[in-house]
Design a protein with these regions (language model features):
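Short, acidic/polar
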Residues: 20-32, 92, 176-184, 311-320
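An alpha-helical appendage that flanks or caps ligand/catalytic pockets
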Residues: 5, 125-161, 203-326, 359-365
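Glycine-rich, proline-tolerant flexible connector loops at the mouths of alpha/beta enzymes
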Residues: 40-61, 80, 112, 198-200, ...
Length: 365
């Protein structure tokens, strides 16, 4: 099992959050991971909401990380490709690849929130189809192929993108929140998969991984092709009860910040079942019910869907994920907003990592 770091912190419009200190944890944790054999650093793409709001463009963030790291892979989790022109995706990430000496990777995602699509509103309904078209387009541009485009004078021209990346072949990932067909589609392309436990549990994921591996093989890819990375909220310490005291309040606050997205989406959402059988929109309008939802969510994560605990207690989950075919755990560490606490937790995470992956990260290729 390999381990990487994942970032998705909330930001709020305060004076403190307008300083460079907002990114201090990202930069220092990335250097820690780079020096201690972690596989990658993942950063997301988020727009128009404090939840994940520090990360509107993962290529910019990855370019900064390229300047302070030397070995670790620099990944977007994810690039919401329907919000971009494929030419710009190829150009921006080629810069990251050049700056990092060939360490750029990114996961394509189709997006989900309609507000994000102010860039290309017409793409929202068919966003998944757009994503798969763009995957082929970006792969071709990355490989140095030209593509036709219409210029400002209305003429059709052929363009190639620059700079040329270090890696001849784009390391391809696709993000899935638990959709089995998305994972099979990734397998048909030979793509790796970034997933999570938001819409599935370990038992469900096990079946999807088995189908993914079978589809890879039937699509002509060699055994060992394709990787499965699972994002897990992470804080590892020495004492289980102390860890619980440290993480519970900030974790619930972090989950609460994500509810602002759901509140905006709820009027257009298909009602879901909340504890007690009420609909999603009704639950989010009632603070007491919303709090029960958050407590329910924390209990689920604590028990079986996060690396919250000690190396011993978290090791059980790591072993179970290994058994179902997970290759990498992407550890989301910045749900806690205290710099010293999170950096201290990295030492516990390192001890856990060394039980399963004692080798250093490979040098940049």
């Amino acid at each position: 099992m390999e381990f990487s770091l994942f970032f998705f912190s909330s930001c709020f419009d305060s004076q403190d959050d307008r300083s460079s200190n907002s990114y201090r944890l990202l930069l220092d944790a990335a250097k820690f991971a780079d020096e201690r054999g972690f596989r990658a650093v993942w950063t997301p793409e988020r727009h128009f909401n404090p939840f994940g709001g520090l990360f509107p463009n993962p290529s910019v963030v990855s370019a900064a990380l390229a300047m302070i790291t030397s070995r670790i892979r620099l990944r977007a989790g994810s690039v919401v490709s329907p919000l971009h022109h494929p030419i710009r995706i190829a150009e921006e990430w080629a810069v990251v690849d050049r700056l990092s000496g060939g360490r750029a990777e990114f996961a394509f995602a189709s997006g989900w929130h309609s507000d994000d699509f102010v860039f290309y509103p017409e793409r929202y309904e068919d966003r998944s189809a757009h994503m798969y078209e763009q995957i082929a387009q970006v792969q071709a541009l990355w490989a140095g192929q030209s593509r036709k485009a219409t210029n400002g004078a209305g003429r059709e021209i052929e363009i190639r993108t620059y700079p040329r990346p270090v890696q001849n072949r784009l390391p391809l990932w696709i993000t899935s929140n638990g959709n089995a067909e998305t994972m099979k589609s990734a397998a048909r392309l030979g793509a790796s998969v970034l997933t999570n436990f938001i819409g599935q549990d370990a038992e469900e994921l096990a079946g999807k991984i088995a189908d993914y591996r079978e589809t890879l093989e039937s699509s002509g890819f060699p055994r060992g092709a394709g990787r499965i990375a699972v994002m897990l909220h992470t804080f590892v310490g020495d004492d289980l009860e102390r860890v619980r005291r440290i993480v519970k309040a900030p974790f619930i606050d972090y989950l609460a910040s994500s509810l602002t997205l759901l509140r905006k989406l709820a009027p257009n959402a298909t009602p879901g079942a909340a504890p007690g059988g009420i609909g999603l929109e009704e639950a989010l309008r009632d603070p007491a019910v919303a709090r029960k939802l958050l407590d329910f969510a924390f209990a689920r994560y604590w028990q079986s869907a996060a690396l919250l605990g000690t190396p011993d207690s978290c090791g059980e989950l790591v072993r179970s994920l290994e058994e179902i075919g997970v290759d990498e755990i992407a550890c989301l560490i910045d749900f806690h907003d205290d710099y010293e606490t999170v950096m201290g937790g990295l030492e516990g995470l390192l001890r856990l990592k060394e039980r399963f992956d004692p080798s250093p990260a490979p040098a940049a290729r």
